[in-house]
Amino acid sequence: MTKRAAYLIVGLPHGGGTFLPAALHAHGPSLEEAGLRQPARSADEMFRASVEIRRDHQSWGLRRRDVEGAWSGVCRRADRSKGDIVVGHELLAAAGDPEIALLVDRLPGFDVHVVVAAGPADPRLTLFPDDYDLGAVLDRWAAHVRSPDRVHLLVTDPGDLTATWAALGRVVGFDAGLLPLPADLEVTADQDLGALRLLASSAGLLATVEELRRAAEEWAKTIAEGGYDVQGDLGGLAPSSPHGDDDEPVQARLDLVSGALAETVAELARLRREHAQLQVRAAKLQKKRRRLKRRLADATGD
């Protein structure tokens, strides 16, 4: 009997595919009619599931009980659903082997596919290799999905979200032309001086243009040898430099740092919103718990 497919969108952070889960959610009813389910009820739930899988709740200022059982809940709904499923969060890009094994093992009724969106090599590569080293991310996940044709790379163009959306449609099985992107997907953020100072102080540790070029070349070789499914041109992984062949001009470095700062501020704003949503949810649950406790006390006469 042929198993259903489970498509896991795992990043990369700032890889040009951050908008994909929101776009999928916006078209949830239409995708269900086409046989593609989304067992995560919300972005908040998938965020908590990802934090749980990564065992990283303390880093987010969360308690274990805030995230415990989130991934199990997603998997239970996946099991009860009909058709293929798609879920994901960019925090999963940096998952280690034990964490990936745990995630995949909870989906025994599915052929698990991993979808990775990546654009030009990111200068934060040397700061956060687990998140931004595309070759390592692909190899880690490929080891657990058992077949290279279940590893899908979407080479993204930061200026063309529609092309990335269409590439995802080809992979998971929907016609992106019939499901246009909502107009309000782009993330905006106010300036956060603390975040700017933090990353600016690390600017000397950011990868150079030449390091990024070498990384992109190595990734292209790894991808070709791995036999992965590629949507797009691998040349799109190379860093863009507005100064042609100059050997790492000062302006190019400044452009890389500026872009990294802007994207990190946007990401910080998004994560703060997710954290705030978690706090509101936790407060509501605590209020409900106190109310039920009072009712129980009244009923028992305690």
What are these regions (language model features)?
Residues 1-302:
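Anion-recognition interface
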